[in-house]
């Protein structure tokens, strides 16, 4: 699970030209849910978000207070594109949790936020909708969170096994293209006796490298 947390002076969500949600001072959270996420990651992320110290205290000391300490608002927006993996220059989202499962998981995430904080201060967008998210970033302050934290899974055999399988899938994907090209290059060519001496060179020059 990934989250981008932004400290804001205000933020809002508009769908179809109509504003459906808005907050004043607080944090805006863009949340990307992975197909590997469980209740454990959910609870960990909720704790991190609500206790993240991105505000100053009464004396002006920076990084001293959380959104709960200040009793500010939280706007949460589901954003599966945070689970993007690039294939060349094209985004691929196969690591994101499937839509129906993700919606239920996201609702559980919101429920946990409201249980852990004041429910009237938690706002959200509209899951699965095309939204315009208006964010007035304060600072700017933007923090990236990940659950589990990068490297934290190395001591967990189950997580390690998942990572190994993901890596194997990536390696197979990368190896598939070159192996086919290699077979093509190594295949014996039939000699065209009617062609000119430059014909073979012309054919090979049309191949993609």
Curated annotation (Swiss-Prot):
A motif (Gly-cisPro motif, important for rejection of L-amino acids) lies at residues 139-140. One of its GO terms (molecular function) is metal ion binding. GO terms for biological process: DNA replication. It is found in: Nucleus; Cytoplasm. Its EC number is 3.1.1.96. One of its GO terms (cellular component) is cytoplasm. InterPro entries: Daa-tRNA_deacyls_DTD, DTD-like_sf. Residues 142-209 are annotated as: Disordered. Residues 159-170, 181-194 have a biased composition (Basic and acidic residues). Preferentially phosphorylated in cells arrested early in S phase. Phosphorylation in the C-terminus weakens the interaction with CDC45. The modification Phosphoserine is found at residues 197, 204-205. Keywords: Cytoplasm, DNA replication, DNA-binding, Hydrolase, Metal-binding, Nucleus, Phosphoprotein, RNA-binding, tRNA-binding. It comes from the Eukaryota. It catalyses: glycyl-tRNA(Ala) + H2O = tRNA(Ala) + glycine + H(+); a D-aminoacyl-tRNA + H2O = a tRNA + a D-alpha-amino acid + H(+). An aminoacyl-tRNA editing enzyme that deacylates mischarged D-aminoacyl-tRNAs. Also deacylates mischarged glycyl-tRNA(Ala), protecting cells against glycine mischarging by AlaRS. Acts via tRNA-based rather than protein-based catalysis; rejects L-amino acids rather than detecting D-amino acids in the active site. By recycling D-aminoacyl-tRNA to D-amino acids and free tRNA molecules, this enzyme counteracts the toxicity associated with the formation of D-aminoacyl-tRNA entities in vivo and helps enforce protein L-homochirality. ATPase involved in DNA replication, may facilitate loading of CDC45 onto pre-replication complexes. Belongs to the DTD family. Homodimer. Interacts with CDC45 and TOPBP1. A Gly-cisPro motif from one monomer fits into the active site of the other monomer to allow specific chiral rejection of L-amino acids. This is D-aminoacyl-tRNA deacylase 1. The gene is Dtd1.
């Amino acid at each position: 699970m990934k989250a981008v947390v932004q400290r804001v002076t205000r933020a809002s969500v508009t769908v179809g030209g109509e504003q459906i949600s808005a907050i004043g001072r607080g944090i805006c959270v863009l949340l990307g849910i992975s197909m590997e996420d469980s209740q454990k990651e959910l609870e960990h992320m909720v704790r991190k978000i609500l206790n993240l110290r991105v505000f100053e205290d009464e004396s002006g000391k920076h990084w001293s207070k959380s959104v709960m300490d200040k009793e500010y608002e939280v706007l949460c927006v589901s954003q599966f594109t945070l689970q993007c993996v690039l294939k060349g220059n094209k985004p691929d989202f196969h690591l994101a949790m499937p839509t129906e499962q993700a919606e239920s998981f996201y609702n559980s995430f919101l429920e946990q936020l409201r249980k852990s904080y004041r429910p009237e201060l938690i706002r959200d967008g509209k899951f699965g909708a095309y939204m315009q998210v208006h964010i007035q970033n304060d600072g700017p302050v933007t923090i990236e969170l990940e659950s589990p934290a990068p490297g934290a899974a190395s001591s967990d055999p189950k997580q390690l096994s998942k990572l190994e399988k993901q890596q194997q899938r990536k390696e197979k994907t990368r190896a598939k293209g070159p192996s086919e090209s290699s077979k093509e290059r190594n295949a014996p060519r039939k000699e065209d006796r009617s062609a000119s001496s430059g014909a073979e060179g012309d054919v090979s020059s049309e191949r993609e490298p």
